[in-house]
Amino acid sequence: MRKFTTLTSIAAPLNETNIDTDIIFPARFLLIMDKLGLGKYAFNERRNTGIKGSNFVLDTPPYLGSEILVTGARFGIGSSREQAVWALTDLGIRCIIAPSFGDIFYANCLNNGLLPIEFNGAEYQLVMQAANEAEPITIDLATQTLTASNICLLYTSPSPRDKRQSRMPSSA
């Protein structure tokens, strides 16, 4: 995963709660051990419906190539399936914004250079609105800010202990 100090991308809105790691990376692909190429299996049941083309948010303009994903609460719950994070990073996702994450998924994000950011309440609604309107969002690690056209929010980065124990870039 490429490190960054700032990231600007249109954020893809996935306004759904309780997305577990089996939805992100289905169990039938668990025997694939090479991290490269796992992105094609991310959200497989939702992206590969058998119909020509997919209407899944990450497959539709203007969200094709989004590096930021804004999701509902409890994203990444369920098993300790690290392949879910590998699939997301291989798909090009570099930051996930949600009200909450599964604990093991959160740790796996930190260990694999995928930035998880938690926002709740009105702040979360502003970020989701920006994503729904396909506004570019900028994440700045040095200032710990998220900005879009009409918002500037401070976020709490992973703790220094979490950064030391992971491969997340530090803001220094």
Locate predicted features.
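Hydrophobic alpha-helical segments, chiefly the membrane-spanning helices
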Residues: 166-172
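Short polybasic amphipathic segments
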Residues: 143-149
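N-terminal, positively charged, Ser/Thr/Ala/Gly-biased leader segments
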Residues: 1-26
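Feature captures the catalytic cores and cofactor-binding loops of soluble hydro-lyases/lyases
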Residues: 25, 31-141
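Acidic active-site catalytic centers that drive phospho-/nucleotidyl reactions
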Residues: 17, 140, 162
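Conserved small/polar residues in nucleotide/adenosyl-binding loops
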Residues: 155-162
